[in-house]
């Protein structure tokens, strides 16, 4: 078992290379997809409905694929207009909060114009702000809708309904009241409120002034036209999402929902969860989401659907409450909510507690190893609020983890030091029993027992580092708090790769390397590679030539592989390697074991000089 420790280390290292290589070469950045052409007008009287009766959008009169109102049949079809022109088609009430700005159209009363004040498309504050929701008629409609469905109730509010507003502004502490009378005995009143972050509260009241009872079903939905460009690369979920009572978390990608059976029509596929209590449904991106939240103590039907209309796919998540029967002169009130904004961890958790929303924290994809990723984020967030820099927080958390695992690591390094001390005896045993593997292994075991050496103890530092590495990678990738979080110098976004590149000599040459160049190697990946190289040179080279070559190339492989990883992860790896080198150096000196670093470096340069001389 003389090579057991080395073999296991190689196996673990190669396994890590395979895992990282899989991400880099297989599930890395996908090729750019063109966004689907969108449609503009939807869900009006007579529009298609899903199996639960909720309106399903369909391009009709007023859409880009139909003649505009007042034109003759056969007139040229109109394409999507600019977002500004689409917003101008309806009178609107302005939304203005510390976190959001936008508007609600009085035609349809959809929440279809929301932008985020505090988030920009790039690191620069001069770049455009993030646009979350957009109206029909624009290139990428994405909106939330609330209403009622039912039979024999006369006209009900739809996408063409013109509501009356009691004001011209929706702001925190300043709710908006909308009213509409269907002319057949039903009066609808909607009060929309918004907090200082990302939560809308929609209170729908309907009064029956007719002489007949009426049965209605309240609903809310989030609809998105066209498949967006996703960024998850299998690391996190993007698409339709929700918590449906006892069925728990449901995640459907844009492709998956289209593979479900027909739902309410041949052009619509989807799945429904009936008679569930507690939960929410929505559509999530990497950092942003829109979610409809029904009353948590009442049963509802939740649904995920995809409707195909020509080249357009319309994705929709919806909830429909149980029937409400209104006797003459009776009224009913339903309160629903809409989350539309950034997936800030603390804000999501606060909403879950404040409104009792079932498992709302699952809006953030912590992954299967949430028991590692959540504590990792908590630690980083805690130190960020103390220090004001997530990069420094990463360094400090790494140091604390090193101290926490110090006893295990010390035992490992002490065992490794003892292995170095008995290296001559191990070499002698291999020579003595080179033709008898059984006796060689027995002699090695006796030596280990005599010297109290654990041959696989050296693997523990690597085993400990692997889960920490992936937990930090997940946190850097999924949490918006890490987005555009600066470190020092040229690192202005810990969640993005090091922006420097060896292609232009790290900025010395006056050009920006094109994105299609496969080599992405910045300063920090090179620093990480150097620290890994030094760590390898702390130990004598393995006697097996194959293993020696693997160890020699590992720093190079990891340097190029981590070049496209988030800078925060590369900084962590470089810092962890540095701490490991210091720790191993101190332990080896304490145990009287020679540190091989300088001899290995001198030997490497001597071999290089000899090779150059021989060629000369």
Curated annotation (Swiss-Prot):
Family: Belongs to the OXA1/ALB3/YidC family. Type 1 subfamily.
Gene: yidC
GO biological process per UniProt: protein insertion into membrane; protein transport
HAMAP family: YidC_type1 (MF_01810)
Feature: compositional bias, Low complexity: 36-51, 64-80
Source species, domain of life: Bacteria
GO cellular component: a single term: plasma membrane
Main location: membrane
GO molecular function annotation: membrane insertase activity
Transmembrane portions of the chain: 8-28, 386-406, 460-480, 516-536, 551-571
Described purpose of this protein according to its UniProt entry: Required for the insertion and/or proper folding and/or complex formation of integral membrane proteins into the membrane. Involved in integration of membrane proteins that insert both dependently and independently of the Sec translocase complex, as well as at least some lipoproteins. Aids folding of multispanning membrane proteins.
Name of protein: Membrane protein insertase YidC
């Amino acid at each position: 078992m003389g090579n057991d420790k080395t073999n296991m280390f190689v196996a673990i290292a190669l396994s890590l290379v395979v895992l990282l290589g899989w991400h880099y070469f297989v599930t890395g950045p996908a090729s750019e997809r063109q966004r689907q052409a969108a449609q503009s007008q939807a869900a009006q009287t007579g529009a298609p409905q899903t199996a639960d009766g909720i309106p399903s959008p369909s391009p009709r009169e007023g859409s880009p694929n139909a003649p505009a109102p007042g034109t003759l049949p056969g007139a040229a079809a109109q394409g999507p207009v600019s977002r500004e022109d689409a917003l101008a088609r309806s009178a609107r009430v302005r939304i203005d909060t510390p976190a959001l700005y936008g508007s609600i159209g009085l035609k349809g009363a959809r929440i279809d114009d929301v932008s985020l004040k505090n988030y920009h498309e790039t690191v620069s504050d001069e770049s455009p702000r993030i646009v979350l929701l957009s109206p029909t008629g624009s290139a990428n409609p994405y909106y939330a809708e609330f209403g009622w469905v039912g039979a024999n109730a006369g006209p009900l509010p739809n996408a063409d309904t013109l509501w009356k507003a009691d004001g011209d502004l929706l702001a925190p502490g300043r709710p908006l009241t909308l009213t509409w009378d269907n002319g057949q005995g039903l009066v609808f009143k909607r009060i929309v409120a918004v907090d200082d972050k990302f939560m809308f509260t929609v209170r729908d009241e309907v009064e029956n002034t007719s002489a007949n009872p009426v049965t209605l079903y309240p609903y809310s939905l989030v609809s998105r036209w066209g498949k967006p460009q996703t960024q998850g690369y299998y690391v996190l979920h993007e698409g339709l999402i929700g918590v449906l009572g006892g069925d728990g978390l449901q995640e459907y990608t844009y492709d998956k929902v289209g593979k479900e059976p027909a739902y309410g029509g041949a052009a619509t596929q989807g799945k429904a969860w009936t008679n569930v209590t507690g939960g929410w449904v929505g559509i999530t991106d990497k950092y942003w989401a829109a979610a409809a939240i029904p009353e948590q103590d009442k049963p509802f039907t939740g649904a995920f659907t995809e409707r195909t209309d020509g080249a357009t796919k319309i994705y929709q998540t919806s909830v429909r409450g149980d029937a409400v029967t209104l006797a003459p002169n009776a009224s009913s009130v339903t309160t629903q909510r809409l989350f539309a904004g950034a997936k800030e961890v603390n804000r999501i958790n606060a909403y879950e507690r404040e409104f009792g929303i079932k498992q709302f924290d699952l809006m953030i994809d912590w992954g299967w190893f949430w028991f590692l990723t959540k504590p990792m984020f908590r630690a980083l967030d805690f130190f960020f609020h103390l220090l004001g820099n997530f990069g420094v927080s990463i360094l400090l958390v790494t140091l604390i983890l090193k101290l926490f695992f110090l006893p295990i690591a010390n035992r490992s390094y002490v065992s490794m030091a003892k292995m170095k001390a008995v290296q001559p005896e191990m070499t002698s045993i291999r020579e003595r029993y080179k033709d008898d593997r059984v006796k060689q292994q027995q002699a090695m075991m006796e030596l280990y027992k005599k010297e109290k050496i654990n041959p696989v103890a050296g693997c523990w530092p690597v085993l400990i580092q692997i889960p920490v590495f992936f937990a930090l990678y997940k946190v850097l990738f999924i949490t918006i708090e890490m987005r555009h979080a600066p470190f020092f110098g040229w690192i202005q976004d810990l969640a993005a790769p090091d922006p420097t590149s060896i292609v232009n000599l790290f900025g010395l040459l006056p050009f920006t390397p094109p994105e299609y160049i496969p080599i992405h190697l910045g300063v920090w990946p090179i620093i990480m590679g150097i620290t890994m190289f030094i760590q390898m040179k702390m130990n004598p080279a393995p006697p097996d030539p194959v293993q020696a070559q693997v160890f020699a190339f590992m720093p190079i492989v990891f340097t190029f592989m981590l070049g496209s990883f988030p800078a925060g992860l590369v900084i962590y790896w470089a810092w962890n390697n540095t701490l490991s080198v210091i720790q191993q150096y101190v332990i080896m000196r304490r145990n009287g074991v020679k540190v091989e670093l300088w001899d290995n470096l001198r030997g490497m340069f001597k071999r290089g000089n000899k090779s150059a001389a021989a060629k000369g």
